[in-house]
Amino acid sequence: GTASGKTLCYNLPVLEALNADPNATALYLYPTKALAQDQQRKIRDLWPDLCFGTYDGDTPPTDRRKLKDRGRLLLTNPDMLSGSVLPHHDSFNRFFSNLKYVVIDEVHAYKGAFGSHVSIVLARLKRVAEKYGAKPQFIMTSATIRNPKELAEGLIKEPVSVVDNDGAPKGQKTFVLWNPPFDESKGVRLSANAEANRLFVSLIKKRVRTIAFVRARVTAELLYRYAVDELASYGLADKVRPYRGGYLPEDRRQIEQALFSGELLGVTSTNALELGIDIGGLDACIIVGYPGSVSSVWQQAGRAGRGRDESLVFLIANADPIDQFIVQHPDYFFAQSPERAVIDPDNPYILLGQLRAMAYELPLKKDEVAQLSENAPAVTELLAEGGQLVPRGNRFFWMAKGYPANDINLRNISENTYSIVEKLKDGNQAIGSIDELSAFTQLHPEAVYLHNGDTYLVRELDLEGKIAYIERADTDYFTQAVTERRVLIQEQRLGRPFNTATFGFGDLDVTFITYMFRKIKFYTRDSFGFGSIGLPPSTLETCGLWLEISPKEVSLVLKYGRDPREGLLGIGNVLASLMPLYILSDPGDVGSAVDSSNTGKPALFLFDRYRGGIGITEKAYEIMEEMLPNALDVIKECSCERGCPSCVGARRSRQDLLDPDASPRGKLPDKAAALIILHSILNLDEYVPPEEESETPWEVKPLSESTEKRLRQMLSQIKEKGR
């Protein structure tokens, strides 16, 4: 659990072993550089004379040489281990020869694509250690998840013992589940962001040290911008900062230090501050929207009231189905986490890069490749056919040019990362980076990009050079891209009937077409204009499950004048939103689409949003019978009449999740059609939708052509003023 003394549990035995054996070494792995640097200060207090340190991209060359020559304890992250340490293992031969312990902190962070990569990085670590005669013991720590043993054993491919007694000191923590009221006149729930801003500003004005966690980078910037505007008149504008991924390392360190020292009163942050970086004692935590897992809620809540201090935590529900499920079922929160962490080291796209790196480090033996995963031998043969490897007897040798570890991005499966470059009068300056799918939706020409509370206009997206060029511009609006999805089944791997419906699972091609963007006003969130996007379609090769309904469901829906596709779209929105309740994943890891082009019948698709898949929808395929009744409950329990973002409508993908309040204002997926379909495939009584008020016809006398023209000009001027 959070603040349960896990760090001390591994520091004491490891440091004792290093003290007993003057040659012994140990490796500490943290999911982020910031965590490693934070822990360095604590170890220095325990053993000032120990030769140790962080080994990451920020480590100066002189310190790197010292750690290679004399270092007893290295604190690093999987990215650095994969990209710099293992490929140069010969210069670390003393360290690896004496390696006694490997500590992996925050194991629950190693899920999905990241965890799938790290499992193979750890296999690379073990084979390098074996070359130098070492067989280190692994110690792992985790927040509460449902399957810690399964995840840990999946990562290191060895049996583990679980220790789960929590003896942490705990101060009183007041936990508030906050559901913004439903606005019947607009048919939507009031803004979670606006509620969060009101709370955040109120707490800062009372000088209550507060962190506000949000689910998207842009939302962190928006909340900060709103807060600064209100706090300026109180002389507190410089007492708050935003914090998120994409900032330069020195900027993040400066914010962390300002929080720790008490210089700052508040911070708006993505989950980048969720893990155990020591930012001092905060008094309050605002969680804007369910972050995707119970463990994340408690990790974020644990940033306030460390030790025995009292603290206040608000979880403000968004309109998403999962948020509404949580606030309607509060007992779920205070029970043991039901989520499973999933990794898939058999992903062929992950294996392609990792096997190249393995062969560069040491020749690949056929038996170790076969033990790595089911697809590893086939991918190895492909590498040999492509001239990357040369087979000799039972081994494969690296023969290609280059440095293959540089081609691996552990945090994603896409090799396409775009740099964000600000155009300045005296040259250009890189201010961040982003993956390709996000670049197409956030950095298209004319998009507004937010960074550190400032607004920038995107002037160019260089697809060949993978660079987005931006310029500083003061705007009173931000942008949100609109995408269309098409799904093609490449190969069906699994299938089974379910009452009148059919489940399937297999390999999919999902094509994303980003064709337009909205302009949305700050504060009011009104959409006041559109623009076209001329970017090429992008295709995601992944895996996913599908639900195909029978002619019976189609007939029932049509009988009531509804569209089956709109019903399936609503069911997909609910299922994708509820996914993190069952499988430890991030909001947006799973996408949904409705397509009838594969079989001629309407089908709902749920797919992993990573190349090759990461196992989420494969696990979901096994538990669909458990998920569908809960999806029905979410829709039935919602107080809306026709459908809203709290049940069937407007769930946002990772790319669309720029501002949770800027949901589409147009027609929502059909609640009644979703209920008709679910009642039928769950063998319940036929659902009869309530009669709706019929539209009253009226006679519209056309205006004269000249009058209509003048009125249109006036409206255009009014709209322009509103910008």
Enumerate the predicted regions with their spans.
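Helicase motor core with emphasis on the C-terminal RecA-like subdomain
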Residues: G1-S82, L86-P363, A370-A405, S414-E415, ...
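Extended, highly charged accessory segments
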Residues: Q137-M140, A317, A359, P363-L437, ...
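Conserved beta-strand residues within beta-sheet cores
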Residues: P159, A284, T455-L457, A603
